[in-house]
């Protein structure tokens, strides 16, 4: 099992934290364990409440069923069903940008 550094940022929310996240742990779960309060609703990859955008690194969100290919190509990630596959940086609270 690998552990990656996941940096979560959002200037408007005052978030700039780097957390450790195992490659078999969802990023949202690791953030909550680290004491961060990120938005979420379904926790199943079927809505957009937890959406963020990945600015560097790679993730696996194959469990999600909400985002279309264009949104994924644009860097959107559902943190509730995303595993890190490298060190990465994610901008949080990006649901509004999807619409």
From Swiss-Prot:
Cofactor dependency: [2Fe-2S] cluster
GO biological process assignments: electron transport chain
Alphabetized InterPro entries for the sequence: 2Fe-2S_ferredoxin-like_sf, 2Fe-2S_ferredoxin-type, 2Fe2S_fd_BS, Beta-grasp_dom_sf, Fd_pln
GO MF annotation list: 2 iron, 2 sulfur cluster binding; electron transfer activity; metal ion binding
SUPFAM superfamilies: 2Fe-2S ferredoxin-like
Pfam family, one: Fer2
Keywords assigned: 2Fe-2S, Electron transport, Iron, Iron-sulfur, Metal-binding, Transport
Stored Gene3D superfamilies: 3.10.20.30
Stretches assigned to the 2Fe-2S ferredoxin-type domain: 4-96
Amino acids binding [2Fe-2S] cluster: 42, 47, 50, 80
Domain of life of the organism encoding this protein: Bacteria
Cofactor note (record): Binds 1 [2Fe-2S] cluster.
Keyword Electron transport: yes
Function: Ferredoxins are iron-sulfur proteins that transfer electrons in a wide variety of metabolic reactions.
UniProt similarity note: Belongs to the 2Fe2S plant-type ferredoxin family.
Protein known as: Ferredoxin
């Amino acid at each position: 099992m690998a552990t990656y550094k996941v940096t979560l940022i959002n200037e408007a929310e005052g978030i700039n934290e780097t957390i450790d996240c195992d490659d078999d742990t969802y990023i949202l779960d690791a953030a909550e364990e680290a004491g961060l309060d990120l938005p979420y609703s379904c926790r199943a990859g079927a809505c957009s409440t937890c959406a963020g955008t990945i600015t560097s690194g790679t993730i696996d969100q194959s469990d999600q069923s909400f985002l279309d290919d264009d949104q994924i190509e644009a860097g959107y990630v559902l943190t509730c069903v995303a595993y890190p596959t490298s060190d990465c940086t994610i901008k949080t609270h990006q649901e509004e940008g999807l619409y």
